[in-house]
From Swiss-Prot:
One of its GO terms (molecular function) is rRNA binding. Pfam families: Ribosomal_S11 (PF00411). It comes from the Bacteria. The gene is rpsK. SUPFAM superfamilies: Translational machinery components. This is Small ribosomal subunit protein uS11.
Length: 130
């Protein structure tokens, strides 16, 4: 079998920003955290699944905390110090993710809730009866 040549397979992005935008999409099943530049180009991302959780554990606050820590470490490595945070969704990972970003050393300029709310749009699914 042929040996693999060259370095690691993961590309290292050469970025020299000092400002970024963190998008936190928090659902009841998972939390996805994406770091972008101000134009919206993705620099790095993490979720409950990428930090090692499976199934229902992806939606826990602890999984969101670990994902946020991973993104924050990568942002600091790239030289990003200041971020805006855009939060979308009602999940349990919203608050722990923001707290972890702050605790990791990122300076948060603003926190904005961008959860889409319909102005009487489509008919919702039927109510869940337990």
């Amino acid at each position: 079998m042929a040996r693999k040549r060259g370095g690691s397979s993961k590309k290292q992005k050469k970025v020299s920003f000092d400002y970024g935008v963190v998008h936190i999409k928090s659902t009841f099943n998972n939390t996805i955290i994406t770091l972008t530049d101000k134009d919206g180009n993705t620099l790095t991302w993490a979720s409950g699944g990428t930090v090692g959780f499976e199934g229902t554990r992806k939606g826990t606050p602890y999984a969101a905390q670990l994902a946020a820590d991973k993104v924050a470490r990568e942002a600091l490595r790239m030289g990003i110090k200041k971020v805006d945070v855009l939060v979308k969704g009602p999940g349990p990972g919203r608050e722990p993710a923001i707290r972890t970003l702050q605790g990791a050393g990122l300076e948060i300029n603003q926190i904005k809730d961008v959860t889409p709310i319909p102005f009487n749009g489509c008919r919702p699914k039927k109510r869940r009866r337990v």
